[in-house]
Amino acid sequence: MLISEGELKLVPYHEISNGQTRDGTQAFHDQEYSYLKSVDSSGDKNSPFYLNSTYIPEQQMPSELNIEQRDASGHVVSLLADEDILEGEAFAQGMGLSSSDFSIQKVGGEFRFLCKGRGHGLGFSQYGGNQLAREGKNWKEILETYFPAMEVAAYEE
């Protein structure tokens, strides 16, 4: 089990990070998730699925689309769509993007979204954890890498 302050907590996972996992307080905008720390997961950059492009026809998009704010790990926190401020994670999910760490480029009559990683980037990276295992780390060392503010404890009834 993974515990923080003597309690079981949410321990999210994702497929591939952008090279660094996200901080829980930045992603959720809530101190309740302060136990989710941003950690290096640069092995994820070796994944063949690290970069993903999605093309969306210009007619399906607002005329103006600009990234307003990113968090410390590079994920889009907010973007301006014409006159509206949109939340980055919700936008990425709604548009079918692989990650909220994306850049926007207008290419011909389309918008190109270049995404780094797959998933929300919080907690455990499946690809990164596998990389650490291949390097000889055991399960406990891997969990301690991705959840440094949490304690690995045995289950007791």
Give, region by region, the residue ranges found by the protein language model.
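Conserved, single-site charged/polar hotspot
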Residues: 1-157
